[in-house]
Amino acid sequence: MIEYTIRDGFPKFQDLPWDYSLTNWPGLTDRLEEVQRGISRHPVVFVNYEGSLYAIKELPTGVALSEYQMLLKMQEQHLPCVEPVGYVQISTGNCQRSAIITSYLDLSLPYRSLFMHSNLGRYRDHLLDAIAGLLVQLHLAGFFWGDCSFSNTLFRRDAGALQAYLVDAETTEHHACPLSPMLRNHDLEIMQANIQRDVF
């Protein structure tokens, strides 16, 4: 059984091979696109509908719903994050899983691109400022990220600087705003550990 929850104004995504894990989609649909991507702990694919790209991430059952709801709350507060499109619950035989669908963030770059391409080197010094600025915005709005890292962020160039966008809200929680000092400090500790891992 496959259950779709998709926002109005977007494709229905019902022609995709949901009976199979995303890792098996190559060769099963001609909608797949290759784009620059960061590192993800879960399978991720990009699909093309009439020139618009969408990211699909496979998750354990139920997780896509919670991430979708968090992204909706962030979007309602005009926070910089990817646009949530919908989620899918899949139950095939003994296998249960879910998937979240988001709009592809045009003109964005994963942090590794800023290290791999010499012509983008001038932006590297702005990475920390950009992700720290994103974290401050989230905390002021009452969001605890729980997994702040370069890998869970995309960047857009903005007048010589960078704007950071949250792309992974699996561990995000919404609390009273502004966030408590204890949770803010915990998020900062997680960010420090994750960034050291990302870079080194």
Model-derived features: where do they sit?
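Conserved ATP-binding subdomain of kinase catalytic cores across diverse folds
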Residues: 13-125, 129-146
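N-terminal presequences and immediately downstream first alpha-helices
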Residues: 1-19
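Hydrophobic residue at the +6 position relative to the catalytic HRD Asp in the kinase catalytic loop
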Residues: 148-155
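Surface loops and adjacent helix of pleckstrin homology
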Residues: 59, 158, 178
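Generic beta-strand structural signal
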Residues: 97-100, 151, 162
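C-lobe/activation-segment region of protein kinase-like
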Residues: 162-200
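Activation-loop N-terminal segment of eukaryotic-like protein kinases
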Residues: 155-161
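Short, flexible active-site-adjacent loop segments at beta-strand->alpha-helix junctions, enriched
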Residues: 106, 159, 170
